[in-house]
Design a protein with these regions (language model features):
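Bacterial N-terminal signal peptides
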Residues: 4-16
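Short beta-strand-turn/beta-hairpin segments enriched in glycine/proline and small hydrophobics
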Residues: 21-42, 115-132, 157, 200-207
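Surface-exposed patches in structured soluble domains
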Residues: 25, 41-47, 53-59, 130-173, ...
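Short, conserved catalytic or interaction motifs in soluble domains
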Residues: 36, 48, 65, 142, ...
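Amphipathic alpha-helical coiled-coil/rod segments that serve as protein-protein coupling scaffolds
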Residues: 52-136, 141-144, 149, 164-166
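Short, charged beta-turn/beta-strand-edge "cap" motif at the junction between a beta-strand
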Residues: 59-61, 67-68, 188-192, 238
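Structural microfeature recognizing short secondary-structure transition sites
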Residues: 138-139, 193-238
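Surface-exposed connector loops and short turns at secondary-structure junctions
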Residues: 163, 167-193, 219-234
């Protein structure tokens, strides 16, 4: 009887733990909510719609910028004049017909005007809102002509060029899972199509309530077949 029990224990210990697939949830690689870059301004034009694919630094919202454009043009003309004045004072100083003090004063005035123009250009650039990531616009909160503020979102953008599938596995599996490990994931909504991913995060904490460990698997998704919110199945502890 003892021999049978020992044999049974040996057989059970040789069976891989958690051989049954663990279900996980697909999430985007990144989610960004974009707001206005200035405290308050009228939207001159919304340049994207829901579903638009965008690239990093692409223009997505144009705020009203007529005043800033005018300020830059005025600064450019002022600099042209001050360049002419500075050259004249420098020439007079070189020919000993003018003072060094006047030449330095006009040169300093020119440099200050250039700095001021850079500040005006920055104010103009802030009126054009750029996408911070490559991705897809999934939510549009504002329309052309509405007010944009730093407290209210304009658009939501997600990046699903790669996706993260989040699993919660038993703590005993932790020792068999490591970052960089290749894991095969089946996506239920794609008729069980199998994708190869890599573990990119193993939570060093156990969930206090369930005792489970969070594990993330990253999968390449250049064709966008896998959607956020789908379910994935994977085996751990094999």
């Amino acid at each position: 009887m003892k021999i049978c029990f020992a044999l049974s224990a040996a057989v059970l210990s040789s069976i891989p733990l958690f051989a049954e697939p663990v279900s996980g949830l697909v999430g985007p690689n990144a989610t960004v909510q974009v707001s206005s870059t200035v405290p308050m301004e009228i939207i001159k034009e919304m340049l994207v719609d829901e579903g638009s694919k965008v690239t990093k630094d692409q223009k997505i919202v144009q705020l009203r910028n007529d005043r800033e454009q005018m300020d830059v043009r005025i600064s450019e003309k002022a600099i042209e004049l001050k360049q002419w004045i500075a050259r004249g004072h420098d020439r007079l100083f070189q020919e000993k017909m003018g003072s060094e003090e006047k030449a330095l004063e006009s040169k300093t005035d020119l440099e200050l005007s250039r700095i001021q123009m850079e500040a005006k250009k920055l104010a103009l650039e802030e009126k054009t809102i750029l996408s911070p990531i490559n991705g897809i616009v999934v939510k549009k909160y504002k329309q052309t002509g509405e007010m944009a503020t730093q407290q209210t979102p304009l658009v939501d953008i997600i990046d699903i060029d790669t996706v993260d599938v989040t699993f919660f596995v038993k703590a005993t599996v932790r020792k068999t899972v490591a970052e960089g490990q290749v894991i095969k994931v089946k996506i239920e909504e794609l008729d069980g199509a199998e994708f190869e991913g890599k573990v990119n995060f193993v939570d060093p904490r156990n969930d206090a309530a369930s005792g489970l460990v969070r594990v993330k698997v990253k999968i390449e998704n250049k064709d966008y077949r896998i959607k956020a919110g789908m379910k994935g199945l994977a085996e751990f502890g094999k």
